[in-house]
């Protein structure tokens, strides 16, 4: 499809923060690193624009959003802050498989007085009790086998 482009192979070894028994301080440090990557890549403004476009089409501009594999929830918290400043009728939830990540995310939510609701869940088995207008994930898909990527999408 793209002449001269060599397909890259994915290295799916577990990352430091995925190691069982990892010291919580190390986990927190790893999630802070991801927060820096998200800030540098400016993913929130672009994501917000897409969410806003979806919300414009929704009745009453209501929007329910779920972030999968949220880590420290910095993206969800930032989106919720923008929505709050603009007085948008959005509900944002975020989940992660790792209870320690959710613990760290809860601290972040409290520290920033955010409305993001957090829970522990597997991205490949999200809650079926709720329906979301938008489900997204960032910095996560590289962890999955190709078949699971298709299943997730």
Where are the language model's segments positioned?
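Class I SAM-dependent methyltransferase SAM/SAH-binding core
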Residues: 66-68, 72-125
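Class I SAM-dependent methyltransferase Rossmann-like catalytic core
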Residues: 16-50, 54-55
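Hydrophobic adenine-recognition pocket in adenosine-nucleotide-binding enzymes
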Residues: 140
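Short helix-loop-beta connector
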Residues: 55-64
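A short, conserved alpha-helix within the catalytic core of class I
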Residues: 144-153
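A conserved beta-strand element that flanks and buttresses the S-adenosyl-L-methionine
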Residues: 136
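Conserved acidic residues
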Residues: 133
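N-terminal auxiliary segments of SAM/dcSAM-dependent transferases
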Residues: 1-20
């Amino acid at each position: 499809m793209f002449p001269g482009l060599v397909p890259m192979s994915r290295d799916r070894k577990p990352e430091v923060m995925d190691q069982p028994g990892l010291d919580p301080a190390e986990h927190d440090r790893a999630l802070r690193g991801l927060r820096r990557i998200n800030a540098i890549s400016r993913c929130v403004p672009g994501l917000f624009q897409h969410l806003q476009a979806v919300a414009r089409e929704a009745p009453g501009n209501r929007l329910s959003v779920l972030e999968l594999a949220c880590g420290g929830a910095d993206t969800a918290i930032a989106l919720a802050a923008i929505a709050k400043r603009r007085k948008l009728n959005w509900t944002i939830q975020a989940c992660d498989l790792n209870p320690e990540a959710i613990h760290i995310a809860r601290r972040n939510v409290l520290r920033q007085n955010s409305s993001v609701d957090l829970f522990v869940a597997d991205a490949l088995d999200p809650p079926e009790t709720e329906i979301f207008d938008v489900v997204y994930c960032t910095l996560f898909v590289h962890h999955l086998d190709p078949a699971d990527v298709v299943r997730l999408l």
